[in-house]
Amino acid sequence: MVISDIRTHLLSVPYRDPPKIGVADYSALEAKINLLVVEVETKSGVIGTGHLHPVAGGMRTLETCIHEMLKPLLIGEEATNVEALWQKMWRATYIQGRMGITVMAMSALDVALWDAVGRHAGKPLWELWGGSGDALPIYGSGCFRGLGHDGMIEKAKRYVDQGYTTIKMQVGHVFTEDEDVANVRDMRQELGSGIGIMLDVNQGWTADEAIRVGSRLDEFDLAWLEEPVVADDFEGYHKVADAIQTPVVGGENHFTHHDFKPFFASRKIPIIQPDIMRGGYTELKVIANQAHDVGIKMAPHLFYQLNSLLNACIPNPMWLEYMGWFDHLWVNPALPENGLLKPPTRPGHGFDFKPELFKEFPYQA
């Protein structure tokens, strides 16, 4: 199954329910769904797809990276040698790469290659990887700080009404410490003791702030405190984890297994959240296995549709994250029921964008 062509498409698609994250750095994310879709075609006629939804722009830069740096490395190669092709791209871009734009571009191609392999075999990826088609636990995300106190609680209650047993709300940034404590207190009172509550700081605090606020929040029996400090502050992560009772988690802004080494060495972060845009399926499987070796669970960031194939076969799955941004974009969306999601049984990763999107919603910078 030799790779014969690689094509890209840039789209700007309206949200059905725009996110209200309430952080200036994420303003581009709130406006529209900017997508880069990549197609890997083989001489046998099989086409695999991958995509990127970066928060901070760079769409044309990512597209250029694919065509200028990576496509020449893959044309004429055997598509089924996915891990070897990942290493070929990694080595060829080592000077400019190792994270950022280059690894994101690699990740989209990696997902597309695996999709092609699954389609060629006529099997869903979880089956190809020796996994199970059983339903997977998924939590309700998107109780955004931009919704305000009442809006966050109302969205969480809608999730509970739909059968979710755990929700995630945001803290920090636009809220004072006292407001954060009041928001979490009221969320707990409204939901009761039987519903898990996760908190997402989006890198909004220093370690000292996280310890001060986190200590006040411990009494609310929280499932986790996510990204309390900036991604590179591993010392801060570990300092916070030592100081509060709530489990500290993170990883969505870390690239490849190399970025996770401090977490694996300390074993103080019990759950990691790698992002499929920062390594693709190939690296996320590596991360999962290395985490499992040191007793750490994995709850991949966003992209619950693609991640369902992964969680179905890794040894240490924890949660999928439901965010319904893409539900109206797929030909056959996967939708949770009562806080559970069954991975698709279609060949490959099983998700195709509606063809009309490519004509109706061209990219708008």
Where are these regions (language model features)?
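Hydrophobic faces of well-ordered beta-strands that scaffold small-molecule active sites
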Residues: G48-G50, I138-S141, I167-M169, I197-V201, ...
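Shared catalytic-loop signature of beta/alpha-barrel
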Residues: S215, D221, D232-L340, P344-P347
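Metal-dependent enolase-superfamily TIM-barrel catalytic cores that perform enediolate-based chemistry
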Residues: D134-A243
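Conserved, mostly hydrophobic/aromatic
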Residues: I3, G45, L70, L109, ...
